[in-house]
């Protein structure tokens, strides 16, 4: 079926280009459907050149949203294993995902909170996001989340939160730093993995966090996209 659809699309385009027919205007982008075929968002057929141009124009963060958009008094404090923020209020999922851990106390971080979820779409699909410290979970393990899901609330405990890329299992109270070849520990050292998550948040409209001119430690694994 997909093959016949492609043939029909090329035929229509050829007729439009060489038969004097005006090609319909492209009104959206192609998206995969459940059967693995393609559907249009906007409902219009397109000249293939328009499809290629539209695909190139799509941002790398398509489908993701700033998870800290509703935090009151948000302040970006520093880059370390992840990114540290001050403020109070709701934290959303950055993209579609599945919760792998959610606890509000005694998880080895200041404030005790720890939430992880594995992204299931977009360029970061398969990677695990963590939010730690002064956060009370609003989700449970196994729950599916979207960019409209509040995963937890930052409370005014004096530590704020740290958020970034977690180890692949999503179950450890350590961040991605050991896997990234960094120096480990709790020191205030900026890491390349933390900087990568900061770049993601900035691309979504979040505030940039400082690294205070320090060298970024560790490496960025190949699985991590650029933003």
Where are these regions (language model features)?
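Zn2+-dependent peptidoglycan hydrolase active-site motif and core
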Residues: 94-138, 155-166
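A structural connector/turn signal
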Residues: 86-89, 134, 140
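Surface-exposed, glycine-biased beta-strand/turn segments
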Residues: 18-114, 146-147, 194-227
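Single-pass alpha-helical membrane anchors
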Residues: 1-17
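Compositionally biased, intrinsically disordered low-complexity segments
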Residues: 10-13, 24, 118, 222
């Amino acid at each position: 079926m997909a093959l016949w659809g492609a043939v029909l699309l090329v035929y229509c385009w050829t007729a439009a280009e060489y038969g004097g027919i005006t090609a319909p205007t492209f009104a959206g982008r192609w998206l995969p459907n459940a059967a693995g075929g393609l559907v249009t968002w906007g409902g219009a057929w397109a000249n293939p050149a328009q499809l290629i141009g539209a695909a190139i124009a799509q941002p790398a963060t398509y489908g993701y949203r700033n998870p800290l958009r509703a935090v009151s008094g948000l302040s970006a404090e520093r880059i370390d294993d992840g990114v540290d923020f001050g403020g109070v209020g709701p934290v959303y999922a950055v993209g579609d995902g599945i919760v792998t851990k959610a606890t509000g106390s005694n998880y080895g971080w200041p404030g005790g909170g720890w939430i992880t979820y594995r992204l299931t779409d977009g360029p970061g699909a398969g990677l695990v996001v963590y939010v730690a410290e002064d956060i009370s979970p609003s989700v449970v393990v196994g729950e599916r989340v979207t960019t409209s899901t509040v995963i937890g609330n930052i409370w005014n405990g004096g530590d704020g939160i740290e958020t970034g890329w977690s180890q692949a299992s999503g179950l450890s109270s350590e961040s991605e730093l050991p896997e990234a070849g960094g120096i480990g520990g709790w020191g205030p050292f900026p890491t390349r993995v933390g900087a990568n998550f900061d770049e993601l948040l900035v691309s979504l409209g979040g505030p940039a966090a400082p690294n205070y001119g320090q060298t970024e430690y560790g490496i960025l694994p190949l699985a991590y996209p650029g933003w």
